């Protein structure tokens, strides 16, 4: 399959998890537009995977200066092929405090990330928020969209998760969507991506993969304030997911 077909299959697989996926991206980019007054923004797609946010940024802001940072060899290969000549691709580990040294520039108008940082330990996320702040220009924004249940609605949040799982399994059963595991099995069977999948397993051994960690949005807002952002709050919410924003 070509890189563009892999992009499309990634989108379908992810949309099965998050039917309102595009809404969070639209909210992010609307915030970017608001703080750049119509000029082309400088954006960092953090833990950007195959380039989901980067592609949407370039579609909305054709003159944008985009950098994508990730560590996954498979997703970086897809991103590199589909974003060639349109974005700077950076291979870096967000678990390493020196990750910013690999960036081609700083002073970003926006650092955007989605459904990625929940794989990091809590203490690392809190520290990372401060490091991200240093990559922003004064007045720039950081937006993190992820699984962030509303802690004051535990019963409804649980039911929303359960119902989402039921609908997702129905999509898998009907063949309308590919599951996470099936998508990666297809990667491993692809002649071009299989070597990258082997490399990926060395970086993220299945047996030692850190468990997902999904605190409520308020935890993230508090962490942003502690990290020195002048303003922090919830930008968007959809069910048990939310996007928090911090303003430098």
Locations of the language-model features?
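Conserved class I S-adenosyl-L-methionine
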Residues: 1-38, 52-56, 143-172, 176-179
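Class I SAM-dependent methyltransferase SAM/SAH-binding core
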Residues: 44, 51-99
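A conserved beta-strand element that flanks and buttresses the S-adenosyl-L-methionine
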Residues: 112
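Short catalytic micro-motifs in class I SAM-dependent methyltransferases
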Residues: 115-119
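A short glycine-rich, Lys/Arg-flanked "PGG" loop and its adjoining helix->strand segment in the class I
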Residues: 126-138
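Short alpha-helix
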Residues: 212-227
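Core SAM-dependent methyltransferase catalytic element
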Residues: 227-248
